[in-house]
Amino acid sequence: MALVKMKRLELVGLNRERKQVLEYLQSLGCVDISDSRCEEVGTAQTAAAISRFDAYISQIMRALEILPPAADGGGMFRRKTNAAGVAYTADEGEISRTVGIAADIIRLAKEKKERTDELSALDVREKTLEPFRSLDVPPALRKTRRTVIRLGTIEGEHTAEELFGEFADGGAADVYIEVISATKQQTALWILYPDYLENEAAAVCTRLNLLAPKGLGAESVAEQLGKIAARREEIARQNSDTNEKLSALAAERGALELMLDRLSVRRDKYRVLSGLGITKTAFFLTGYVPEELADKLSDGLMQKFTLSVQLSDPEEGEDVPSAFDNNALVSPVEGITSDYAMPSPHDIDPNPIMAIFYYFFFGMMFSDAGYGIVMMIGCGLLGFGNFLEPEKRRTFKMFFYCGVSTTFWGIMYGSFFGDMIATVSRTFGKGQLALLPVLVDPVQKPLSVLIMSVAFGVVHILTGMAIKMYMTWRDGNRFAAICDTGFWIAVILGICALAGGSALGSAVLANAGKIIAAAAAIGLVLTQGRDKKNPVMKLFGGILSLYDITSIVGDVLSYSRLMALGLATGVIASVINVLGSLGGGGIFGFIVFVAISVFGHSLNFAINMLGAYVHTNRLQYVEFYQKFYEGGGRKFSPFGFKTKYYKF
């Protein structure tokens, strides 16, 4: 269980076999090809082709998003189609035809969207016109030779008599008012008055907050509403035709998916081609291959092609890609590490050690046997069954093992869906059954669980520091390993011995802890300022280094979340059981209990599982990896068939 050892591959071949060599390497999928360009040799001009493939791929992806889902539902549970016997290359005719289909799908969807936008605009216009439906004069008419016409709406429901009084009070009694429509929300008005009353009437209209509609047009309102209805019917027919065409084109989904993968494979090949060194007759390729595959790869290349292959160990400082090689228990958590950072060539593989703590801490925070069994069943089926692609199963395998740990800690804490066994026994039976804790009841003894959590945190931190000490020692800096890490380990162990001796009443252990911690602290004072030239600054730097103990204490206290989340899971689960039992015994009470339990425990499961996942990751990233893990490496990404729908 370690990082995969890599071999550097250098290959020189003939240009006439270049295409075949690249396709052979792509079919094997075991070589991470590096950029081999240099000033002394030329390169292939592939930028235009790559850009064209990118455009085709983008177009096909947009078309697939538009089409209805695949018959198998797609999504996480869709497996790649085995394309054995199907060529992964396509001629220009096939590409042109398939991209044309994608373009038709996009065009139809665009036209449909434009019509949908038009419908929205028609709805707005109809809403504006509807209050004036019964208006029998052109709405655009605003003035005659001696009169002024105002058209608009005011808030609330009003009568012509009420409004006439408003105008009369405003000095514009010589006015004609027609209420076109009235609802509780608004009243639509048509107002006519002599032009010599413009100022007075305008003031009243302003006071009433008369809002004039915009863009009513020259035709009558009834004619405009009729045209809107006719246009809406026409759009419905056009959308129906478009939907039929899109449904017919849905039969091309398989062809589009196949072409998408074909173009992706071809684009990847052109990207690799752009990084090769090329002369008039030959090409040069470099990369990295796992050591266990190197000889087999070299023999295969030499047998099939006329070329030269050289394998060598990478030199110090090379950008060697990293890959993990772990067993079935450890490999599921590799994604946790790669999400943080891939290891550099200087790092060790942290996964074997991290996996132990990861499963342990997750279970301690989720800590319910019922929830753990649910996780084991669900994630076990998805992780070890044949429902998903192999690369999709890894996360579910990780949560399966987390479920095992959760079940273990649930038994230790006496929690099975909280206190469901005791609640069911008490509500529907004689109250004689209960799951007793094997180790400790966190509700009754939270302090004991807190001490245990902090103790596990100390072990976690010391493990990280021990790894750092080992790596420094391995690199030949033995003095630094002892002074920079060893002394701190001794300080922590001494403090732990002091605390343990005081708690247990053991003066010998407490005194030993004092001596160890004090001696290690003196060692830190004498060595942590060794990079300074001034003796006073050396001493001051050493004394100042002791302030780092506050950071270590903060790290240790952060493990209190192991107690807090574990306690929260059990307490909330028990509260849900209490709520469910309020219906009492009998059939009705049982139905109420089941309904509340299913809903409540599902919610509690989701929330606390997410919390356990997030905080377990945090403990690894912040408290553990920062003690020794440098990262900064590059993930091994072999040149191969990176497809979405088909396996070539």
Task: Annotate each PLM feature.
Residues A2-R8, K19-L22, Q26-I33, D295-F648:
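Conserved, carboxylate-rich catalytic/transport cores that coordinate ions
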Residues M1-M354, E389-F396:
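Long, charged N-terminal accessory/stalk domains
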